[in-house]
């Protein structure tokens, strides 16, 4: 895989010690870091492996390959983690001992202005693709979706109460542009009158989150990865997942509690009881960053860490 030459800077790994403890690393074991990024977690895992140990690192972003570990115990997989099961089968792994997922968007993505993940600069194109070779970008969604579809997107993925008004304003604004909405600045202008100055950063973050989730099918990929993890882990293997917003955390919480990303409805629970989970939850409540880490690494502020062991 060809890697661009420019230097790549990623985030400091969040809750590194807690993740390593959660994985309960066997030096001779096989592990997967499905969100390789800058390689911070992976480097720490490899340091605990013997010459017999193995680590696979997944990342769909071409930039991540610049950080690949030059270690014979490590294999980089340039793919979306939704294909975890496919690649474990390809590499002949009949069971792994631990899987780590840090679901946060790296600071690298926000700092690379041309990727369009951040609203801090108005000039970039609205891209937001984690894999730049993948399908449609955020601009295509904003220009092609009707008001109803945009409203649903903002409501479900951004949890925005004014989703309908935002969608209507975007549709109205894009019709005034000969080339449609293309840049971050144009999107900001389209929604400016609907956002309270006091909550501007929070509401813009929710808008951009909703678009990013849609562009990359993040929740669909997460569901596939979780289901694959259950099949790939050996009995006694550990799943360690770090989430950064309520949509992800709810899916992970349900999956560990019920074995499915959607909780059973009340009627099913009343009639049949809760389904038996294939997981023993090591953390009944999610772990959060220490006061010191919050001070040293602001990115850890919204992180929630859940750990479970396959029964």
UniProtKB/Swiss-Prot annotation:
It comes from the Bacteria. PANTHER family: 12S RRNA N4-METHYLCYTIDINE METHYLTRANSFERASE, S-ADENOSYL-METHYLTRANSFERASE MRAW. The lineage of its organism: Bacteria, Pseudomonadati, Bacteroidota, Bacteroidia, Bacteroidales. Specifically methylates the N4 position of cytidine in position 1402 (C1402) of 16S rRNA. Belongs to the methyltransferase superfamily. RsmH family. S-adenosyl-L-methionine binds at residues 39-41, 59, 87, 102, 109. One of its GO terms (biological process) is rRNA base methylation. The keyword Cytoplasm applies. The gene is rsmH. This is Ribosomal RNA small subunit methyltransferase H. HAMAP family: 16SrRNA_methyltr_H. Pfam families: Methyltransf_5 (PF01795). It is found in: Cytoplasm. Its main location: cytoplasm. It catalyses: cytidine(1402) in 16S rRNA + S-adenosyl-L-methionine = N(4)-methylcytidine(1402) in 16S rRNA + S-adenosyl-L-homocysteine + H(+). GO terms for molecular function: rRNA (cytosine-N4-)-methyltransferase activity.
């Amino acid at each position: 895989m060809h890697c661009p030459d420019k230097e790549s800077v990623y985030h400091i790994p969040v809750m590194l010690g807690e993740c390593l403890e959660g994985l309960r690393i066997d030096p001779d074991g096989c592990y997967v870091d499905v969100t390789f990024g800058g390689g911070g977690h992976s480097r720490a895992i490899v340091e605990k492996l013997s010459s017999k140990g193995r680590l696979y690192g997944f990342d769909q972003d071409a930039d991540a390959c610049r950080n690949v570990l030059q270690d014979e115990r490590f294999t980089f997989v340039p793919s979306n983690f939704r294909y975890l099961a496919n690649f474990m089968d390809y590499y002949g792994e009949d069971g792994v001992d631990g899987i780590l997922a840090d679901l946060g968007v790296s600071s690298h993505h926000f700092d690379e202005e041309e990727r369009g993940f951040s609203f801090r600069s108005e000039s970039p194109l609205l891209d937001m693709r984690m894999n730049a070779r993948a399908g449609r970008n955020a601009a295509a969604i904003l220009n092609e979706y009707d008001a109803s579809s945009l409203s649903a997107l903002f409501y479900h993925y951004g949890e925005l109460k004014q989703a309908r008004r935002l969608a209507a304003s975007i549709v109205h604004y894009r019709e005034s542009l000969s080339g449609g909405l293309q840049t971050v600045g144009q999107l900001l202008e389209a929604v400016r009158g609907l956002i309270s100055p006091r909550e501007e950063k929070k509401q813009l973050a929710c808008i951009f989150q909703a678009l990013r989730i849609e562009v990359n099918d993040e929740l669909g990929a997460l569901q596939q990865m979780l289901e694959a993890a259950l099949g790939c882990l050996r009995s006694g293997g550990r799943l360690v997942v770090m989430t950064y917003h309520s949509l992800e955390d709810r899916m992970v919480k349900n999956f560990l509690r019920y074995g499915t990303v959607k909780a059973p409805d009340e009627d099913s629970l009343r009639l049949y009881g809760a389904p038996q989970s294939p997981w023993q939850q090591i953390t009944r409540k999610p772990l959060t960053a220490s006061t010191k880490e919050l001070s040293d690494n602001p990115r850890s502020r919204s992180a929630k860490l859940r750990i479970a062991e396959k029964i």
